[in-house]
Amino acid sequence: MADSSGRGAGKPATGPTNSSSAKKKDKRVQGGRVIESRYLQYEKKTTQKAPAGDGSQTRGKMSEGGRKSSLLQKSKADSSGVGKGDLQSTLLEGHGTAPPDLDLSAINDKSIVKKTPQLAKTISKKPESTSFSAPRKKSPDLSEAMEMMESQTLLLTLLSVKMENNLAEFERRAEKNLLIMCKEKEKLQKKAHELKRRLLLSQRKRELADVLDAQIEMLSPFEAVATRFKEQYRTFATALDTTRHELPVRSIHLEGDGQQLLDALQHELVTTQRLLGELDVGDSEENVQVLDLLSELKDVTAKKDLELRRSFAQVLELSAEASKEAALANQEVWEETQGMAPPSRWYFNQDSACRESGGAPKNTPLSEDDNPGASSAPAQATFISPSEDFSSSSQAEVPPSLSRSGRDLS
């Protein structure tokens, strides 16, 4: 801005070439000029030197500056009285006596409202001077417009932040209230279902009561008939119970029918009952004691029988063991006296014995020492029962002492 003003003061407009070059320079200056922010700096305006021919314009600017300064003072007074009170909602109660000295005229609604008509007037007025004085007239208006836009932007930002905070608080409260309403709705639904169930149950009970009343009214005349039928049915059941075990009489000759037989049997049973009543068999205390003694005797007999069975089983087991031991002793004595040849004939075949011995003759005659009681006939591969040979040998060669001991064991 200083360079442009210097050029306008040092080089006056002479000739058409200068006017065209001035227009070009004016356009270039308007496109590349940088305006600094003058937020809250209305009183610190830089004064610029104007040429001698522009005295009326400077006077107009001074008058406008004085008018603007008076308007700024008024807006400051209004903002100090009203604006400060509007923006002190977050301060403490003790701060009300000494409010802070804050200059909030740039973001106050009243100052904005007052400045907007002047800005519109100043922007609408176009300077009718030369191209060198045009940038000096437009620069204050543009700076004021920029300041106004910045103040409005700040105000809108504050309002948006406040709205967001309020919206978050409202959302939290709405969610809380919605949760409470949902819980209350569930409770009311449960209560409604319970009341509906009770209503349906009462209706069913009422319907059943009406049906029962109608049935009672219809069946009340049949009460006497039902009582008589009950007595007859009880008599029939008793008769059926007494005659349900009756034997078939198809193959038995009876004089008369079954009813006559039952009458005669009933007469005999009555006679038996009378005789037993005369003898007092069923009501005496002695019979009760005898029955108790009989039950005790029965229990003792069962226990003794069980013990006898156990002892008899043990005796049989001992007898079997003794017989086994006696047989083993007799077998051992016989084997000692006879040797190993006879047992080999009992338990092994002659052919297999010859094969095991490695090609020995199959029909080998036994010597008289091996079998003294046998004849001199040729020996054959025959199997002799061990019990028969054992009994014969034991009778022939067992000493009497061993046989006596065996009989004692057996």
Curated annotation (Swiss-Prot):
Regions of compositional bias (Polar residues) in chain numbering: 373-384
Keyword Coiled coil recorded: yes
Region feature Disordered, mapped onto this chain: 1-104, 118-143, 353-410
Chain positions found as N-acetylalanine: A2
Cellular localization per UniProt: Cytoplasm; Cytoplasm, Cytoskeleton, Microtubule organizing center, Centrosome; Cytoplasm, Cytoskeleton, Spindle; Cytoplasm, Cytoskeleton, Spindle pole
Biased composition regions of type Low complexity, renumbered to the chain: 385-394
Coiled coil: 156-208
UniProt GO BP: cell division; centrosome cycle; regulation of microtubule nucleation; spindle assembly
UniProt keyword terms in alphabetical order: Acetylation, Cell cycle, Cell division, Coiled coil, Cytoplasm, Cytoskeleton, Microtubule, Mitosis, Phosphoprotein
Domain of life: Eukaryota
Modified residues (Phosphoserine): S105
GO cellular component, one term: nuclear microtubule
One GO MF term: microtubule binding
Family designation: Belongs to the HAUS8 family.
Quaternary data: Component of the HAUS augmin-like complex. The complex interacts with the gamma-tubulin ring complex and this interaction is required for spindle assembly. Associates with microtubules. The interaction with microtubules is strong during mitosis, while it is weak or absent during interphase. It is unclear whether this interaction is direct or indirect. Interacts with EML3 (phosphorylated at 'Thr-881') and TUBG1.
Function: Contributes to mitotic spindle assembly, maintenance of centrosome integrity and completion of cytokinesis as part of the HAUS augmin-like complex.
Name the UniProt record assigns to this protein: HAUS augmin-like complex subunit 8
Natural source organism: Homo sapiens (Human)
